[in-house]
From Swiss-Prot:
Enzyme Commission code(s) on record: 3.2.1.26
Pfam families: Glyco_hydro_32C, Glyco_hydro_32N
Residues that coordinate or bind substrate: 46-49, 67, 109-110, 177-178, 229, 313
Family, per entry: Belongs to the glycosyl hydrolase 32 family.
GO molecular function: inulinase activity; sucrose alpha-glucosidase activity
Gene (name only): INV
InterPro entries on file: ConA-like_dom_sf, Glyco_hydro_32, Glyco_hydro_32_AS, Glyco_hydro_32_C, Glyco_hydro_32_N, Glyco_hydro_beta-prop_sf
Record keywords: Glycoprotein, Glycosidase, Hydrolase, Signal
Active site: residue positions: 49
GO process terms (BP): inulin catabolic process; raffinose catabolic process; sucrose catabolic process
Full protein name: Invertase
Top-level taxonomy: Eukaryota, Fungi, Dikarya, Ascomycota, Saccharomycotina
Residues annotated as glycosylated: 71, 118-119, 172, 218, 375, 381, 392, 420
Source organism of this protein record: Debaryomyces hansenii (strain ATCC 36239 / CBS 767 / BCRC 21394 / JCM 1990 / NBRC 0083 / IGC 2968)
GO cellular component, one term: extracellular region
């Protein structure tokens, strides 16, 4: 897996009236051992869906807003837009709250941000740089309805003024939310995709000025679950061509195939009015349990880059962290390519590449052309640990299978440091007998792991990257572990799996071991393990 490098006071709006209560600590601060180093987290409070992602071309800064409750570590109203920024998509700096509701029983729900270069909204004059004409489009959720509202910023997205004639769309519904807006060059207008959540509709609207919207069409495909949320629609380039396809994203919760919440996507064409799928396939974005509410950055013309919420609504409110809860995934770059589903079928698939910038390599271990045996594992011997490690390996299945009725596996074990005379581990494995990868995050000493929805063991099928000259399957896997989250990228990102995990107090990832329970069945063609620091 290649690591992509991209070149990349409290002055509130007068409309953000409610006072944010001071955070009350309800338990031990776990920041030292399970706060991720490079995954965006709030300093205190609750975080969920990414909102309003945009790139400021004037300052070369990436902005991420998110659903935020500063008053507690669980979801609850009043709900705000928190705000963080980054110069490299790896290191994040928290800002003041950006948007807030009028009353304590209301919420500024999910939405997006656009740059109104041509001042179609009329909110700006020439004193505001064209690259910083920031307009937020969001769901205003009040007890009896959800409407789509807008607000504008005159200081590059730090503070916002709400439009006096809000709402801009009101369809008299309590389940109408999460607008994602973009400029459609071909028809010279703004496009909004927004969810009629419990009707399983993604509605497509058009506007010339961000204020007056016309309904164009409905998109109604996909795996249903309980409701649709957090849609998106964007052009994604096809690798090794000058072409692209439109991709529709949507999230479902609850009721995803793996339980709880997840993301799906569809590939097709968009003419400015209607999105039409190229095929009838519903594609899954991530095979893990902790990847939801995906959104792409606007106004980044070079690449398609996005973030997701790295949690699951089945257990997000009770994960053992304090004084914050939840993180984002790593930023990922997205392209499309044809990928083998089996030996006879290729389909167009999203390819996901993690973005890591400006990290120090503290320690590393390398191995090449190494045949694993039961008594000869490869293990790091790092004297220190930041809790931030990655591994990149290509391995080949060799020889004849010994027994198709028993496990014949290669495992990547992530061990904690020794603390209180014990260590803890999670593992990723490949079982030759069924040609599947599996993940095990079961840590018996942690009470939270008894939560029935925090699925500890699950698997996914991954087609080989390729076959060698002897017709033996070859697999690639890149993984990055950051205190309490593991992101896996199979076969150069053609499939991913994102999962959180929780070790005992004062334990965090320290060593990585590559092992097998059989002799001579797996050859490490290449292996690189690194300890990193931010």
């Amino acid at each position: 897996m290649k690591i992509t490098t991209l070149v990349a006071s409290i002055l509130m709006s007068v409309l953000l009236e409610p006072v944010i209560a001071s955070f009350i600590d309800t338990g031990k601060d776990t920041s030292a051992y399970n706060r991720p180093l490079i995954h965006l987290t709030p300093n205190v409070g609750w975080l969920n869906d990414p909102n309003g992602l945009f790139y400021d071309k004037k300052t070369s800064v990436w902005h991420a807003y998110y659903q935020y409750n500063p008053n507690d570590t669980i979801w609850g109203q009043p709900l705000y837009w928190g705000h963080s920024s980054s110069k490299d998509l790896t290191h994040w700096e928290e800002h003041q709250v950006a948007l807030g509701p009028q009353n304590d029983d209301e919420g500024i729900f999910s939405g997006s941000i656009v740059i109104d270069y041509n001042n179609t909204s009329g909110f700006f004059d020439e004193s505001i740089d064209k690259d910083q004409r920031v307009v937020a489009i969001y769901t205003n959720s009040i007890p009896d309805t959800q409407t789509q509202d807008i607000a504008y910023s005159l200081d590059g997205g730090e503070t916002f003024t709400k439009y006096k004639k809000n709402p801009v769309i009101d369809v008299n519904s309590t389940q109408f939310r999460d607008p994602k807006v973009f400029w459609h060059e071909e028809t010279n207008k703004w496009i909004m995709v927004v969810s009629k959540s419990q009707e399983y509709k993604i509605q497509i609207f058009g506007s010339l000025d961000l204020k007056t919207w016309d309904l164009h069409s409905n998109f109604t495909s996909g795996y249903l679950g309980n409701q649709y949320e957090c849609p998106g629609l964007i052009k994604v380039p096809i690798e090794n061509t000058n072409d692209y396809k439109w991709v529709m994203f949507l999230a479902i919760n609850p009721g995803s195939p793996a339980g709880g919440s997840s993301n799906q996507y569809f590939i097709g064409e968009f003419d400015g009015f209607e999105f039409k799928q190229d095929d009838s396939i519903t594609r899954v974005m991530d095979a893990g349990k902790d990847f939801y509410a995906f959104q792409t950055f606007s106004d980044n013309e070079q690449d398609v880059i996005g973030l997701a919420w790295a949690s699951n609504w089945q257990y997000a409110n009770v994960v053992p962290t304090n004084p914050w809860r939840s993180s984002m995934s790593l930023a990922r770059k997205y392209t499309l390519g044809y990928v083998n589903q089996n030996v006879e079928t290729k389909i167009m698939t999203l390819i996901q590449t993690p973005i890591l910038n400006n990290l120090d390599v503290i320690n590393k271990v390398e191995k090449n052309n190494h045949l694993l045996t039961k008594n000869d594992s490869v293990i790091t011997n790092f004297s220190s640990s930041t809790g931030l490690l990655d591994f990149n390996t290509t391995f080949k299945v060799v020889g004849e299978s010994i027994d198709s009725n028993s496990l014949s596996n290669i495992e990547i074990l992530i061990h904690s440091q020794m603390s209180n005379s014990s260590t803890e581990s999670i593992k990723v494995g490949f079982d030759r007998s069924v040609s599947a990868f599996y993940f095990n995050r079961d840590i018996p000493n942690v009470e939270f792991n008894n939560n029935p929805y925090f699925t500890n063991k699950f698997s996914t099928y991954v087609e080989p990257s390729h076959y060698d000259e002897d017709d033996m399957p070859v697999y690639k896997i890149y993984g990055i572990v950051d205190k309490n989250i593991l992101e896996l990228y199979f076969n150069d990102g053609t499939q991913t799996m994102t999962n959180t995990f929780f070790m005992s107090e004062d334990k965090y990832p320290h060593q990585i071991e590559i092992a097998s329970n059989v002799d001579g069945q797996f050859e490490l063609q290449s292996l690189l393990i690194r300890e990193l620091n931010n």
